[in-house]
Amino acid sequence: MKLTVHGCRGSIPISTPQTVMYGGNTSCYELIFGDYQLIFDTGTGFRNVKLDNLKKTIIFYSHWHHDHIQRLAFNSGIFNSKKNIYISSALNDKKESKSIIHSYFSGFYFPIELTKKLSNLKFIEFDDLKKDFEKDFKIEFLNLNHPGGSVGYSVKNRKNKITILLDNGYDKEQFFDLHKFAGKS
C-alpha cells in the first residue's frame, strides 16, 4: 500500500513559506494498492491526484464540509468519460451523497451541473461497495465527533492496514474505540 497525502489542511488552503514542508492544500489522501486507487476526500489537494485509468478508482468521503469536497470538479481526470469513478460515504446513503454533490456543483454555486454532465461518476452504497471488493480488501468505518457528522476509514488488504481519521473533536471516551479501530495500522 502506498499512501500519498495531497492535502491535510483544514478549512481553507494556504500558501506561505511556513506551509512548504507539509503543503497548504485541504483534505485529500490517495491510497494505491493492487488494482485499486482509493481517494479519501476531494479537498484542494485532489487537483494533484493523477487518476489511474488502469485501476478502479473509488472516492470515499469522510463528511461533506466545503474543505473536503471543494475540488472534485477541478481534477481533469474526472472528465474522461471512459473512466468510471465510484463515490461512496459511510456517513449516508448514495442518494444523499449524490444530492449533496449535485447541489454543491450545480447552477447556483458552480457553472456546470457535474452529476448531470458526468455519467462516469457512479454513486454506490458503502455496504454494497464493501461486499463487492471484500475479496481484495476490507474497509470499515468509525463514526467520529464532528459537527454534521464524520467517519474515519480503515482499509486492510492481505499485507497491510491503513487507518484514516480526519476531522474529529477528540473526547477521552473515544480512546478505546479509536485504539481498537486503528490497531495494527
Label for each model-derived stretch:
Residues 1-163, 170-176, 180-183:
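Binuclear metal-dependent hydrolase catalytic cores
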